[in-house]
Structures are given as C-alpha cells and as structure tokens.
Amino acid sequence: MLGVCYYPEHWPKERWKEDARRMREAGLSHVRIGEFAWALLEPEPGRLEWGWLDEAIATLAAEGLKVVLGTPTATPPKWLVDRYPEILPVDREGRRRRFGGRRHYCFSSPVYREEARRIVTLLAERYGGLEAVAGFQTDNEYGCHDTVRCYCPRCQEAFRGWLEARYGTIEALNEAWGTAFWSQRYRSFAEVELPHLTVAEPNPSHLLDYYRFASDQVRAFNRLQVEILRAHAPGKFVTHNFMGFFTDLDAFALAQDLDFASWDSYPLGFTDLMPLPPEEKLRYARTGHPDVAAFHHDLYRGVGRGRFWVMEQQPGPVNWAPHNPSPAPGMVRLWTWEALAHGAEVVSYFRWRQAPFAQEQMHAGLHRPDSAPDQGFFEAKRVAEELAALALPPVAQAPVALVFDYEAAWIYEVQPQGAEWSYLGLVYLFYSALRRLGLDVDVVPPGASLRGYAFAVVPSLPIVREEALEAFREAEGPVLFGPRSGSKTETFQIPKELPPGPLQALLPLKVVRVESLPPGLLEVAEGALGRFPLGLWREWVEAPLKPLLTFQDGKGALYREGRYLYLAAWPSPELAGRLLSALAAEAGLKVLSLPEGLRLRRRGTWVFAFNYGPEAVEAPASEGARFLLGSRRVGPYDLAVWEEA
C-alpha cells in the first residue's frame, strides 16, 4: 500500500477536498497528519481547537483514506516553553537551546512528560475510536538534531537515580568505572555529574552509562505515549518513524513497545552524507548508493520484529544535505518497489505538496507549491497501478543474518581508537558485500536466534552477553566475528582474559595488541582466499590454531575453530566479498557476481532486480522465468520482477 504525509494546516480548507480526491485517484490509501500541530490544536493553555482537525480527518475519510495521526510532542508551542523554560534541552557545551525549530524539549523533564501526557490523552480520547484513524505515530524522529542526549539539571538528577538503580552502591560504581584512575572516586551518587565539559576526555565507562541512560529516557518517554494510546485507542496500531544512519538510541529496545517500526527513507541525502570515495558519490548522486535504503529496510524490519513501514519516502530533492540533487527519472518508483520487496507494508511519500514557506520550503513533495504534480507524483501513481495488478507474496526468513548492536556504536563513539573507525561503516561494508553476492539479509539484535540461517555475520560486538553467546552456540551455520568483538566488559573494561572475552568459549585465541592505521598505511594478508592489502585496523592474536590468512610478519589475520571465524583486521571490500562468498558456498547458497549497481531481493517466490546504474543490465533470471514487471533487460534506473519456474 502507498501513503503520503499531509499538512492540512498549511493550506486553505477549500483545497482539502480536492487534495483528498486526488490522493484517492492516485492510488494512495494512508495519510499521516498532525505530528507538528500542537500550537494549532492548543493555541493558548487549555483552549483546544479541534475543529480544523475534525474536518481534515472527515475530508480524508470521505474519500476512503485511512489516517495515521501523529502525536504533536516533537514541537511544544511557544506558550508552553515560556511558561516552563526548563523543558528546553541543554547541549553538550552547556548552552540552553531555544524555541524556533523543532525537538526543543528534554526527555527527562517531569514537566514536559506531564504536558505530553495531557495532550496525547486528549488526542487519543477524541480520535482513538474513529474508524478513519488507522493508527498513531508517536512524536517524530526521536533524536533528530542531536537531541537524545541532554545535559540539563533534570538529566543530571535522573542520571544519578539511574546509576543507583543499576549499581546499588557507590562502591560498586567506583569498581565498575575504575575510578581509581586519575583520582575520580565518588563518595555518593550525588557527586556524579554528567560527562561533559571535562578538561580531558571523560571516563569511558561514565560516558557509556550516560549514553545508555539517554536511550532509556527516550524509551520511557515513548512508552508513556504508547500506554495512553493503548488505553484510549484499542485496536489502533502504534508506530514511530526512526531515521537512517542513526544510532543515538536503541531502536530494538524502543520498538518493543510498538506494533511495528517505521523509518524515513531519503537515499540521496544519506548518500551525500556517507564517507564514500568521491567517484562513488558522483556515480550514485541521483540514485543513492544501492545499499543505503535496502540496509535500513532490513534493519527496521528487524527492529519491527518482521513488520515495518516507510513513513517518509523521498520524492525529489531534499533540503538538508550538503548537496541536494534531483532523483534520476524512475528512482522514486524504484525506491518504492525496493521497500515493498524488502517487506514494507506501506510506503508513504513526504510530502503531498512542497511547502512555500519556512524551514523546509526547498524540500520537494509529490506536488510543486503551485499544486502541479511533480516527478514523484507520476512515479508513485505508476507504482499504485502496478500494485493493483499484483498480490505480493509473504516475506520469508533470509538465508543470512547480520547482527547489529546499537551499544557497539556507542562504545566506538566513546573510544574509536582511530579517526576512521566507524561501526556503521564496518557494518555497511559487510552488508554491501553480501548484497553484491545477490544474498538476502536479515538484520537482528545480539541474542536473537540464529537458527535457520545458513550463516551469520557479526561485524563487531564488543560486549558479548550470555544471551548472545548462547545464540552463537545454537547457530546452525558458520558465524563470522569481525574485529574488536568481545573486546570490552559490560562496564567498559578490557576483559581479564583479554579479548575476545566470552568468545574464547568458541574460539581459543587471545588478542594481545591492536593498532589503528592512518590512511595509506597498509598491511598485506594472504592465504587460500587470496592476497589482500588491509588498512585502518589490525590485531595481534595468540592462538593454537593455524590461520587462514597471515600477515607478512607471520601473525594471523583470520582464524577458524569449527563453525566460528575471527577476523583480526578491518576487511577490504575484496576480502569481505571473497570470505562471505566462501561461507555462502560452504552453506550451499548460490552466489552471483552482480553488475555494478544491480541488486536483488526475494519475496516469497518472486525475485526483484533493481538497477541503480545508467546502463541497461541483464537480469539473472532462469530461462523459464515468468516476468511480472519489466523484462530480462533491466533499463537504467528501472526494475524487474519475475517468478522462477
């Protein structure tokens, strides 16, 4: 199904009916509204003006459209900020943020939590029983604009309580944090401050706990809203729209309270922000990198326990990246079908009409500001027509699992030990290598069952808890661990037995030294898989095992014991591809050597091919394949769908 984000409050009421009619005629079924409308719903304290929203919902419902109603807590109104200025967050430099944008509140503020409770309750009581309202989106893009981590007095107070609940005694905290170092010992929890504005870097254990606390505060704020919506809107779904390449909060944890996950897909903006080689950025400037959207579809399908929506789909140029090119003709259609191929239940475009005013006036919509349809509209309408003629099969478990850990991202943010070290970069390297082989991937959290997967990839898991170790033990196929796995304890210390810590129960080896390498400084590793120049990161391993790859100094780069492999270096794309191809072959999976820019995804018995390149390519379909969309020749920025005989 397809949907759209709509802002009736931005347009004259006389236009609403025509907009709703055109939405229906375009094949759209769902419309998200209301997520930034608090000041219009409550222009003054206690004076509620529901009439316009009542009318907007009724107008959409009259055309058979289903409404996704956003709770308006991402934008507290000016009168609320003036009455309670303490709700404004404080940045890491100690500066109080101001009114005039969005997301201007602190998750720990008791006052703001009560105000959020009040407005969400009123909203749910009024609209929770309406047939036209299919469900609710809580808030909007938690953490956008660097807002997960606040440094206000309320956060400090709440953090102290969080620490006491976690450690019980200040002696236990001192032991966990290693506060004997630099004379950091605390006599009570009341002495612990937030980890910022220190002369030298803060204690890494302190920082990690603060990041955990901040993520927990977002989850608590979201849960407050979910509980209200469950009570007053039974039978309605509750979701939240997460962001791309964003790790400040643990989406796996937060989504436990949701019916499914949603995310906002902007492939061109994300590609422009990625640390890609310049030539690759140029190659995919108008399409997005072929694995950007797919990675997030697979991630948020995992976050949503098998269910996800794209709540905002890029329809044209955006306004927030360093450069904002227009999508190549056909890409809006391709992105939409790609989301559906990965299991999206709804793809909703942002937005119906480009705003002529304010901060996002340069952000394209399905229509121009003068209401004329734009590129995205025509491509969305085509998808709707194609969808009407097809019944998508269910999504099956992928053959490969990739273990993704938000806590790992926090640990490497706290202690990268190398300027180029990026957890997301390493994850993306492995994910992209799998996709280039034509393999489908499920992204799962640590501790998720790995049964049924041909093999699993763990790009890096610094803290290995018992539930994760048990899942690795029960895995039926090979498990590949990347560098720095098992390198930290839960309190951010080096394991007494040395890394990989608990993984030594699976792999008899010790990492005794590590180094980060500046760009251009390479170590060569070679073995049965080939010869590979490697950079960025290298580890020295002691093990009673014969390495599968060896550095030129004779030290091992890749080890294996039974089903388990450990890679003691940052892999090159070539090494990742060769190693993953070997594991796939061992597991009996068919791998392909796909042309540059071509990617596949299977959904049931259907195979989807997406061509991100400027040249036509041949679809890797069998002779007897039955094409449902397109043909064996997949044109530039086009797709094909077929069913194998």
Swiss-Prot record:
Activity regulation text: Inhibited by Cu(2+) and Fe(2+), and moderately activated by divalent cations such as Co(2+), Mn(2+) and Zn(2+). Considerably activated by dithiothreitol, beta-mercaptoethanol and cysteine.
GO BP: galactose metabolic process
GO annotation, cellular component aspect: beta-galactosidase complex
Residues reported to bind Zn(2+): C106, C150, C152, C155
EC number: 3.2.1.23
CDD domains linked to this entry: A4_beta-galactosidase_middle_domain
pH-dependent activity: Optimum pH is 6.5. No activity is detected at pH below 4.5.
Superkingdom of origin organism: Bacteria
PANTHER family, sorted: BETA-GALACTOSIDASE GANA, BETA-GALACTOSIDASE YESZ
Designated name of the protein: Beta-galactosidase
Organism listed in the record: Thermus thermophilus
